[in-house]
């Protein structure tokens, strides 16, 4: 097994526009994102912190760093998953998010799990 496969997490994302928490007249667009993190490696590892890069359609970038996710620093065994839901606000009807999770394996090895860019967008309404 390669080192790359020994230390690996996968991340999947589902997004949702929150119309009831948004106000287009105030340029306030609320979105939820549901994350599933899976330890696809061969050793147990703990998610320590996160780094998000949130970009709206105007190109405004907001970086968010913090410990854990939703108050937790989950320790995941191989093939174990952790799910959570969080949210963000944009000043435009659409934008994107991407980032990384900083992770430490039980043997002390530090690595990052990449969070591929995903889109946040107000659904189009057809009349």
Outline where the language-model segments fall:
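Short, solvent-exposed loop/turn segments enriched in Ser/Thr/Gly
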Residues: 28-34, 98
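Short acidic, flexible loop segments centered on an aromatic residue
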Residues: 43-62
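Long, contiguous binding/interaction regions
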Residues: 13, 17, 43, 59-60, ...
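Intrinsically disordered, low-complexity Pro/Gly/Ser/Thr-rich segments with frequent PxxP/GP/PP motifs
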Residues: 62-94
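Low-complexity, acidic Ser/Thr/Pro/Gly-rich terminal tails and inter-domain linkers that flank the onset
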Residues: 1-28
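Short glycine/serine/proline-enriched coil/turn segments at secondary-structure junctions
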Residues: 23, 44, 91-95
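Terminal connector regions
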Residues: 89-127
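Asparagine-centered strand-capping/turn motif at beta-strand->loop junctions
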Residues: 37-41
